């Protein structure tokens, strides 16, 4: 199997470590790094491993050229056996993730992953019972499917319109944390709840303050 790492930032480097550990062949592409800006025919690769910071339009173009585009979350969901708790929201997700991580480490063991912590691929099966993952709208938008055990949705305000295009698409990316769940949690704000929350089949646990 041959892979192309598309984007060589923090996540791209974690892809590199993951593939090296698996002893798999790969190339790296990053338009902003001269060492890695060689153009490739994407069709020749078995899989394209995309970083979350790739612009939405470019990501859609990549998927048209190769139908096996994966994110680090897709691989983590497949390979890791810990109980996975995802946290997203416009504000306070880092704070929430940090305090949950501290709490879980008092009574058990926990990874702190995502934007606030380590790359998810660096923590696959490292003997921690829980993985607390801070998730951005970029990550949620690009992941294939939601394999979290629990999802926590905090507040949603207008943000990242340069990536998503409009507020509705931004909300849809956040909605993905609530799909395919046994249990979810969200911040109770009577002025900003969305109709789609009431349609979720998962168990809903409401709260007003952290």
Give each language-model segment a name.
Residues 1-86, 208:
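Short, basic phosphate-binding NTP loop
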Residues 29-36, 105, 109-127:
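Conserved substrate/cofactor phosphate-moiety recognition/catalytic segment
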Residues 30, 35, 71-73, 113-117, ...:
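Short loop/edge segments at beta-strand edges and connector loops
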């Amino acid at each position: 199997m041959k892979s192309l790492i598309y984007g060589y930032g923090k996540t791209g480097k974690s892809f590199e470590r993951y593939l090296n550990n698996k002893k798999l062949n790969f190339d790296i592409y990053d338009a902003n790094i001269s060492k890695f800006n060689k153009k490739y025919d994407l069709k020749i690769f078995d899989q394209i491993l995309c970083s979350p910071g790739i612009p939405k339009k470019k990501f859609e173009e990549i998927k048209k050229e190769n139908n096996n585009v994966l994110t680090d979350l897709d691989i983590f969901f497949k390979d890791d056996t810990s109980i996975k708790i995802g946290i997203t929201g416009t504000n306070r997700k880092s704070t929430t993730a940090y305090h949950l991580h501290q709490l879980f480490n008092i009574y058990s063991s926990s990874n702190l992953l995502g934007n606030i912590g380590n790359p998810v691929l660096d923590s696959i099966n490292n003997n921690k019972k829980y993985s607390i993952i801070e998730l951005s709208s970029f990550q949620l938008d690009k992941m294939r499917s939601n394999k979290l055990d629990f999802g926590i949705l905090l507040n949603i305000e207008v943000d990242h319109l340069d990536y998503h295009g409009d507020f509705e698409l931004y909300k849809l990316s956040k909605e993905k944390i609530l799909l395919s769940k046994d249990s979810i949690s969200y911040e109770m704000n009577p002025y900003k709840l969305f109709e789609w929350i009431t349609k979720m089949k998962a168990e809903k646990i409401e709260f007003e303050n952290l």
